Amino acid sequence: MNYLEFEVIWGVNNIYSILELKSKLIYEGIFKGKILETGCKEYSPLVPGDIVLGYVYGSRKVYIDKRVSRKNILWRYNRKVDLRQAIVSNVDNVLIVNSANFPEMKNFFIDRVLVVAEEQNIVPVIVINKIDKGISQRVEEFSEIYKNLGYRVLKTSVKTFEGIKEVKEILRNSRTSFIGQSGVGKSSLINLIDSRASQSVNEISEKYSRGKHTTVYSISFHSENWIIVDTPGIKEFGVETLPFENLKYYFKEFENFASFCKYKSCLHVSEPHCSVTNSLGNGISKPRYESYLKILSELKNYKNYAK
């Protein structure tokens, strides 16, 4: 049996569609045993972007033997099984898709993704979608906050095609994950960029009796120019792999003030003579600071599975 290297495209019920890296042929992969030993507790051992090694048997069938170490990972918390659940791995960019009006932008969600992206060396881009329906004042205000911090913010519409060219430029020659909550138009945006993605989603939905245009698991799409990963609508995004004392380094706006704090170990919470807390509303955004406090509290009470 040939022992080859593959990339995971998608999977359900421990049956995976995997791409052989040299021939670019699609194989069906399964675990030879009941589980794949990965050395950590998690709900889904394989996600799009994972590189695996396996033995070919039969006609395009593979026994998956090993998962290669991941360069990076994005994950969420699965409450049903009380475990972390990987979403995608080994990505270059993450596009954080939001609606310009409804559903309401969740700045706390954006801040969580930004922290993880920075910590995992993934380039984050904030996308404001559905701008043809108007942009709320709240969204405009947060867009300016993120722009002033140096984050790229794109405004897009699948109806007017605004911003689509810029999105394609980001995708070119890279692997990019689209992250966002349900209803923000994430999958519609992907389908406009690559029509083959829509066809693939429909075929998979029909095969597994899922609703069309509803992403219930991560799926990657390969083209000559890019690799796109569509992900399920996410309510809770995992951050708990980060040591709590390091969180402050991933809030860019703190950098210009932290050196003036009395204590080098200052966490910018209730310490005396803290330059960060003294600058709230004057260089430090209050909503961003509230996100910092929420995430910090979570990290101090992390789950063991996240380490």
UniProtKB/Swiss-Prot annotation:
GO CC terms in record: cytoplasm
Cofactor, free-text remark: Binds 1 zinc ion per subunit.
Origin: domain of life: Bacteria
Pfam families from the UniProt entry: RsgA_GTPase (PF03193)
Residues of the CP-type G domain: 80-237
GO terms for biological process, alphabetical: ribosomal small subunit biogenesis
Residues holding Zn(2+): 261, 266, 268, 274
Binding site for GTP: 129-132, 180-188
GO MF term list: GTP binding; GTPase activity; metal ion binding; rRNA binding
Enzyme Commission no: 3.6.1.-
Obligatory cofactor(s): Zn(2+)
Subcellular location: Cytoplasm
SUPFAM superfamilies, per database record: P-loop containing nucleoside triphosphate hydrolases
Keywords: Cytoplasm, GTP-binding, Hydrolase, Metal-binding, Nucleotide-binding, Ribosome biogenesis, RNA-binding, rRNA-binding, Zinc
EC class: hydrolase
Family according to the record: Belongs to the TRAFAC class YlqF/YawG GTPase family. RsgA subfamily.
The protein's role, per its UniProt record: One of several proteins that assist in the late maturation steps of the functional core of the 30S ribosomal subunit. Helps release RbfA from mature subunits. May play a role in the assembly of ribosomal proteins into the subunit. Circularly permuted GTPase that catalyzes slow GTP hydrolysis, GTPase activity is stimulated by the 30S ribosomal subunit.
Subunit structure: Monomer. Associates with 30S ribosomal subunit, binds 16S rRNA.
Name of the featured protein: Small ribosomal subunit biogenesis GTPase RsgA
Organism: Borrelia garinii subsp. bavariensis (strain ATCC BAA-2496 / DSM 23469 / PBi)
